[in-house]
A protein has these predicted regions:
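A generic structural signal for tightly packed, nonpolar segments enriched in small/aliphatic residues
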Residues: 28, 41-45, 181-486
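Short amphipathic alpha-helical segment within the helicase RecA-like ATPase core
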Residues: 1-248
Length: 486
């Protein structure tokens, strides 16, 4: 199969304009493609397709996809590069049509941006069907022509990184337990000589005095793991690393503060923070990015049992602060509190944590963007600029003292794990809670609860767990590796 792009005609130009690959193919079939397009309905709109069979012996089926305006660039209103997004969406829908025809290979027009085209193809074809007997046919996307093969390959690596997090998030919680999560990541990193993976057991966690993390883990029969990854891509192994921290709750029932049963199965993806940061490191290693990265993922389940945290219990975090656990379902911040304390051991250039932390984040921004709470404008600028390119957007949220007061005003301990006014500003009080465990001057907390899954909002992702914002983290790390400022 073959997927070719076509731009929508500007008002006066009349005939729609092919990409250069589309033009070349049209010449190859003596203008037949343009002729067929002109007689088979209105001009192709952005994201719409036409499919033609039997035009050329090498390509039994050719899908023409609408790319929208030719010179679409950064859209200030939308905070993304519209041209790139249009290519991703169009290529994804074209590749899926080839897949529906059970054609095993598809060649993709680079559409002027081979990286975006590769991302659209690889992300658009991904589906989790490991556990089904009846599987969709596997389709391998390849670049049509050889002009932009380096950019294409980069796009494939970026997209495979996001697909790895989608896989980890989508898989059932009895398949991706804390131990199996860690083993899966270790196996992905085994071939890189500049990566060390430490799978720390419960006994190690206890010696580190991570009392908040352990208090959550003790409710489950699954043993907790603290996963620590060292990627040494920098010129000097002693260069200050970028530290990623990801919440790794492989299943979140809520604990004694039990969640409603409807939709609880989606909580198999409550390790989305760990999945995205670990996948970003796997991708950084595949791209051989020239910087050092450390990944930290506290992994456990949050379950109700005779051993579980009870509402009102007080636990002690690694830095000695005590926390009153007023709601056992605000557990992600307990794991992150200890992991953030530990992250300060590495003289980090920046600490970036990701977590499916609060339903309130989903209420605030929905799935349009990841909420970013940060104490560093320098860090924010890098994350924001990266997100414009990837189309996986971020939006800055407040870290006001206003919210800190609501978590420090606590009857029995230094901090309460939910804000004084419970639901009001829930994403912001959670961020304020985390800030109590951070002394680093460049720290960002990404609340990814709203972007955890995709219904149909992102056209190049199928319905299911989204693996967002993995590509933005990778692009951010790539930009950081070029920035000597700090």
């Amino acid at each position: 199969g073959l997927v070719l792009g076509i731009y929508s005609s500007e008002k006066d130009e009349g005939a729609a304009q092919f990409t250069s690959a589309g033009d070349a193919f049209d010449r190859l079939v003596s203008g037949k493609l343009r002729e067929l397009l002109s007689v088979c309905g209105p001009p192709l709109k952005k994201g719409k397709t036409r499919i033609f069979h039997g035009l050329h012996q090498d390509f039994p089926s050719v899908v023409v996809v609408g790319l929208g305006k030719k010179n679409a660039g950064v859209n200030e209103q939308e905070n993304w590069n519209e041209g790139k997004e249009n290519i991703r969406a169009a290529v994804a829908v074209g590749c899926r049509q080839i897949q529906d025809l059970e054609i095993p290979c598809v060649e993709v027009d680079p559409c002027g941006d081979a990286q975006a085209a590769a991302e659209g193809a690889v992300l658009g074809l991904h589906e989790y069907n490991e556990l089904k007997q009846k599987k969709k046919p596997v389709v391998t996307p390849q670049l049509h022509g050889s002009a932009e093969s380096e950019a294409w390959q980069k796009g494939v690596i970026y997209a495979e990184g996001q697909n790895l997090s989608r896989y980890l998030m989508e898989a059932p919680a009895n398949y991706i337990t804390p131990v199996k999560f860690a083993e899966h990541i270790e196996q992905k990193l085994r071939s890189f000589s500049n990566v060390k993976v430490h799978i720390r057991p419960e006994s190690w966690i206890a010696t580190q005095q991570m009392g908040a993390f352990l208090s959550v883990a003790k409710g489950s029969a699954e043993p907790p793991i603290f996963l620590e990854i060292h990627y040494l891509g920098g010129a000097n192994t002693n260069d200050s690393p970028l530290v990623f921290v990801g919440k790794g709750v492989t299943f979140d029932s809520g604990g004694i503060s039990l969640k409603p049963s409807s939709g609880m199965d989606a909580m198999r993806a409550d390790m989305g923070g760990a999945a995205t940061v670990c996948s970003a490191i796997v991708t950084a290693a595949a791209l051989n990015l020239p910087l050092n990265i450390i990944g930290l993922a506290p992994l456990c389940e949050n379950m109700p049992s005779g051993k579980a945290n009870k509402p009102g219990d007080v636990v002690r975090a690694k830095n000695g602060k005590t926390i009153q656990v007023d709601n056992t379902d605000a557990e992600g911040r307990l794991l992150l509190a200890d992991a953030l304390c530990y992250a300060h051991n590495f003289n980090a250039r920046a600490i970036v944590n990701a977590a499916t932390l609060t339903g309130a984040m989903d209420v605030a921004l929905g799935s349009a963007a990841t909420g970013v709470f940060t104490n560093s404008s320098w860090l924010w600028t890098h994350l924001y600029e990266a997100s414009i390119l990837t189309g996986d957007r971020v939006w800055r949220m407040p870290l006001f003292e206003h919210y800190t007061k609501q978590v420090t005003d606590c009857p029995l301990a230094d901090l309460s794990n939910i804000g004084k006014y419970s639901r009001a500003g829930g994403a912001c009080t959670a961020a304020a809670f985390l800030k109590e465990f951070v002394t680093a001057s460049h720290w960002a907390h990404l609340d990814i609860a709203g972007v955890m899954s995709n219904k149909d909002e992102v056209p190049y992702l199928r319905k299911g767990m989204a693996g967002r914002p993995t590509r933005t983290l990778v692009e951010f790390a790539a930009r950081l590796s070029q920035d000597s400022h700090n």
